[in-house]
Amino acid sequence: YNDFNTYIANIFHCSVFKRDQFLTKLKSYPSQDAGLFEKFKKDILPLKYGFKLGDIEKAAKYIYIETQTFSGMTISEKTKYVDLKGKYKSKYQHLIDKLENPKWQLKIGNITNVENESFETVIKKYDTPDTLFYVDPPYYKMEDYYTKEFGRDQHLQLANELKNIKGKFILSYYVFPQLSEWFPKGKYHWTTKEFSKANSTTSKKKTTSRGEELLIMNFKPALTL
C-alpha cells in the first residue's frame, strides 16, 4: 500500500502493524469532544509530511479531526467541528468498530508493506512483468478537496508513467474529457463498477446510495471486476 499523504500512510501503518496499541489510543478519546477537536487541530496544523511511519499519536489525532467533520477530505484552519449532540453514532466510533471487525482485520492483514512515496518512486521500485498496480488518484479538478501533494499536472504525468510500465494497472477514475486522449478505449479496457456509499442523514436510520467508478486497465480481465 502506498499513499503520498504521510498522515494517511501512517494511519494504515498503525492499523496493520500496531493495531492493538492503535486501538487502545483511539479508545482513550471520547467519540465527540469539541475542545479535543480544536486542540488536535492545533497539534496537527500546519500539516507536516515526511515523518517516520508508525506514529500512533499523530495517526489518532488526524483520524479524530477527520471524523468530526462533514467531508473528512482535507484538514485546514477552516475545518469545522460537527456536533452530533449524542443523537447519532459518530464516524469516529464507526471507524473504531471497523478496525475491530474481523473481516476488516483479515482484509488489511494482506498488506505486507506500507509506503509513503511518489507514484514515480513506487512504479520504479516495484514494476515487473508480474506486478499489478491499483491506482486511485484524486479526482481531476477536485485536487484541492484533498491535500496539496497531488497537483493537476500530475494526472498527465501519472498517465504517461502507467502507459510505459512493464506490469499491469487498474486505474480508478471518473469520466472527464482528457481520459479518452490519455487512454483510448481501443487500446485500453474501460469498465464501470458500482459501489455503496453512505448518505448524510438526519435520522438514526443508516441510508446508502449507489455510486459508480470508472476502471481503466492495460489488460482485459478474465473475470468481471
Language-model features, listed with the residues they occupy:
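Long, positively charged, glycine-interspersed low-complexity recognition regions
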Residues: 151-225
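Soluble or luminal CAZymes and related metallo-dependent hydrolases
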Residues: 94, 114-115, 150-157
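Glycine-rich phosphate-binding "P-loop"
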Residues: 141-151
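Short alpha-helix immediately C-terminal to the canonical SAM-binding loop
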Residues: 9
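Conserved SAM/SAH-binding beta-strand->alpha-helix loop
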Residues: 5
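Conserved SAM-binding loop
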Residues: 12
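SAM-dependent nucleic-acid methyltransferase catalytic core
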Residues: 16-134, 138-143
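Short beta-strand "acidic-cap" motif of Rossmann-like dinucleotide-binding folds
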Residues: 1
